[in-house]
UniProtKB/Swiss-Prot annotation:
GO-annotated molecular function: 4-(cytidine 5'-diphospho)-2-C-methyl-D-erythritol kinase activity; ATP binding
InterPro entries assigned: GHMP_kinase_C_dom, GHMP_kinase_C_sf, GHMP_kinase_N_dom, IspE, Ribosomal_Su5_D2-typ_SF, Ribsml_uS5_D2-typ_fold_subgr
Annotated protein name in UniProt: Putative 4-diphosphocytidyl-2-C-methyl-D-erythritol kinase
Keyword Transferase: yes
Length: 282
């Protein structure tokens, strides 16, 4: 039995630069991890099947599951002639902008690499993982990084300063393709990628909070005004910085002090079913 942990990611920044010829958007984003995790275990089978064992109403256990897709890709690429049972204990909320599915897929690739003794480097796994998800290369490494291209170009950055994180996911679903479709690339915008990288380089917490920026945030907020209400609530209750992660709908607030973080948690807990008080990992 092999075990892997799959931490959630958050965006410090997210910029979309232009629409590529392959239909994807060219992006630049700074991401890190938080200590909200899914836990996965992997056990060999003798029947050559890939079986995903998960008890969750909104997560498929068939070939639509990203962990299944990752395993299928690994089996095909490395000619694996055995089976595997992938058990997922899920804490990361679904369709939240926290890369829960990608984190599970990345953990599956790392786990199968160990289970079957494939000897692949993390770089090799990341290069393979981009075939099934743009966040998977980042999730393979689980280190603070700036990701460019489709997400496959990963440049590591220093770990962020220590901080509490309050994550709040409203009870709405957001389709990432719909958000990108609604994005107007001609609109003026400011995303503070360089300021964010400087903040991490200098371990400057306040500069980091001032650099939080996401080009998709106003698009998702226009679709779902509750996202803005949660962000405003967090800032009014003392968050040092707040931002929507990914294409949403999860919003997070940063706080240096535990009491400050608990105040924010209590303020948003009444209006969101899924609220988490965690720490930055990086």
């Amino acid at each position: 039995m092999i075990y892997e942990t799959a931490p959630a990611k958050i965006n410090f920044t997210l910029d979309t630069l232009f629409k590529r010829d392959d239909g994807y958007h060219e992006i630049e984003m700074v991401m890190t991890t938080v200590d909200l995790n899914d836990r996965l275990s992997f056990e060999k089978r003798t029947d050559n099947k890939i079986v995903v064992d998960i008890e969750h109403n909104y997560v498929p256990n068939d070939n639509k599951n990203l962990a299944y897709k990752a395993a299928d890709l690994m089996f095909e690429r490395f000619n694996i002639n055995e089976g595997v049972t992938i058990s997922i204990d899920k804490d990361i909320p679904v369709s939240a902008g926290l890369a829960g599915g990608s984190a599970d897929a990345a953990a599956t690739m790392r786990g199968l690499n160990r289970l079957f003794g494939l000897g692949q480097s993390l770089d090799a796994l990341a290069a393979l993982g981009i075939q099934i998800g743009t966040d998977i290369p980042f999730c393979i490494y689980n280190q603070t990084a700036v990701c460019t291209g489709r997400g496959e170009q990963v440049t590591f950055l220093k770990r962020p300063p220590s901080a509490w994180v309050v994550l709040a996911k409203p009870n709405i679903g957001i389709s990432s393709p719909d958000v990108f479709k609604a994005l107007d690339l001609t609109e003026e915008h400011i995303v503070h990628n360089e300021k964010c990288k400087q903040a991490l380089e200098n371990n400057d917490y306040h500069l980091l909070c001032n650099s939080l920026s996401n080009r998709l945030e106003p698009v998702s907020m226009a679709m779902h005004p509750d996202i803005k209400k949660i962000k405003d609530n967090m800032l009014q209750c003392g968050a040092d910085g707040a931002l929507m992660s990914g294409s949403g709908p999860t919003v997070y607030g940063l706080a240096q002090k535990e009491r400050q973080a608990k105040n924010i948690y209590n303020a948003v807990n009444g209006c969101c079913n899924e609220v988490y008080l965690v720490r930055l990992l990086g």
